[in-house]
């Protein structure tokens, strides 16, 4: 099985990364199960199939091909072709983002953080009337989820790590270390603050387990309401919007909800977690970055040098 081969070849990769690579490879294989990697031998055909994709997407597909091919010790010349594509796009990506300019797609969908936050406030007002209802319909649950997800991302701009299992503190404590490593958990103690335990994310091998205590008053209050009204007998934090019963098991499920809400509420703007991270950090640090760049020019060094050498705690 390819996943096992990749994991043996690259033990540092997280399950999230391996699953993303496998998903990309299935797409390159026309959506068919992967029995071998012969479809990657047609390099020109693969590049033609990706010709209309944005550069970051092409880079991700090329990287998936590299990981798979090197795991089975494929022809080095073929690996180099994909590596050259990835490296060129990495350089292009780095040079572009060094300018701090928005991509055309980001520009088309960008809103200021205050505008997005106002959207969340409006969604909160829309669900205010259901807070005292004892029984929630599917439509009510869907509407509340469409408020809660954007709210969470304005407070905690993670990637898409909110595919989570809800557990009590005692149930979490009974999990083995191996069980904890395999998932992301929303821990809701009877007493004390709620917190997130995140092990499955893109850079988990580098940064390890993340434990995030929830202390934002609006978010905590809204989550308490949600925990009371989620579909009974379920352990997922969020759900597929159709039916509101099936757990949201992929980051794509979260993205669909986020972009659907922003398109409806913000005049067609498509804002998922990735773009919202840019918007959030730009609002928080853009002026600071401009000041650092100006000071660095006067002082004759780079911003990176200023951060690493001159700025002290």
Question: What are these language model-derived features?
Answer:
Residues 6-92, 254, 274-278:
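Non-catalytic DNA-binding core/recognition domains of DNA-processing enzymes
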Residues 13, 172, 301-307:
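Short, basic interhelical loop/turn and adjoining N-cap
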Residues 72, 142-146, 152-180, 287-290, ...:
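A short, glycine-centered helix-capping/turn motif at helix boundaries
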Residues 78-134:
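Flexible interdomain linker/hinge and immediately adjacent N-terminus
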Residues 118-160:
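Basic, Lys/Arg- and aromatic-enriched nucleic-acid-binding interface segment
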Residues 165-217:
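Conserved tyrosine-mediated DNA breakage-rejoining catalytic core shared by Y-recombinases
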